[in-house]
Amino acid sequence: MRTLQGWLLPVFMLPMAVYAQEATVKEVHDAPAVRGSIIANMLQEHDNPFTLYPYDTNYLIYTQTSDLNKEAIASYDWAENARKDEVKFQLSLAFPLWRGILGPNSVLGASYTQKSWWQLSNSEESSPFRETNYEPQLFLGFATDYRFAGWTLRDVEMGYNHDSNGRSDPTSRSWNRLYTRLMAENGNWLVEVKPWYVVGNTDDNPDITKYMGYYQLKIGYHLGDAVLSAKGQYNWNTGYGGAELGLSYPITKHVRLYTQVYSGYGESLIDYNFNQTRVGVGVMLNDLF
């Protein structure tokens, strides 16, 4: 653990170091949004003060899983009748609280991401929601153009993340994290790394880092109009983790056809220690680019 803390300290200090490189930072707040940059997008001024911005991807897909974690939801009176096919959707939005808090390329922001697994076809049990994860964040972000070895560092973000399924015992799952998010691009490639440090009480899931690790890695590739994506988390000490692959293609100006495959542990909080493979297809409103 001391080794991990020693590694994380410089990571969490990196945002301030990058911000200090004033010579490499351009004023992007009044320029066209940088492709794939969450922070540059949030720095765009709009006439409507209530404008919300996409944070993570927003999608709705119909899915089928290889196995269902009925043991974790045994306290639900419909658990034995739970189905393997579900509608999975994610809503993820951000709002700039204070643009320019530490210079023209900085923003104090908040985001909210909700991911749900809905037993839509289970009409005999009134189509219940098997699991919903609620993930609010408060963060400080910087839009940069720091270049290294052909890559351009676009987003530097550090903040506080709360992730919970909003349930009471015995199905309550939650954890709190301090995190840093770094996003860089190189041509059609996008790479994002998000290390975190768990804080507070994890009594509901004391071994969650065993399966979820201490970071998330995300990779995107723009292939013509299509976007290929991969993201995952892994604990090198335990050998547990999970990965998600995605492919999207535009079908209208604002809607994309989306296919997703998730395999491993941690697809949801209730399944953080459960191994499965889920395949889904549906629509998406925004991808990584």
Swiss-Prot record:
Q: Which residues lie on this side of the membrane: Periplasmic?
A: 21-52, 100-105, 149-150, 187-188, 224-225, 251-255, 287-289
Give binding positions for Ca(2+) 3.
204
Organism from which the protein derives: Escherichia coli (strain K12)
* Assembly and interaction partners: Homodimer; dimerization is reversible, and the dimeric form is the active one.
Annotated active site residues, numbered on this chain, are 162 (proton acceptor), 164 (nucleophile)
Q: Which cysteines are joined by disulfide bonds?
A: none
Which Gene Ontology cellular-component terms appear in the entry? cell outer membrane
Q: What is this protein called?
A: Phospholipase A1
Q: Does the keyword Signal apply?
A: yes
Q: Where in the cell is it found?
A: Cell outer membrane
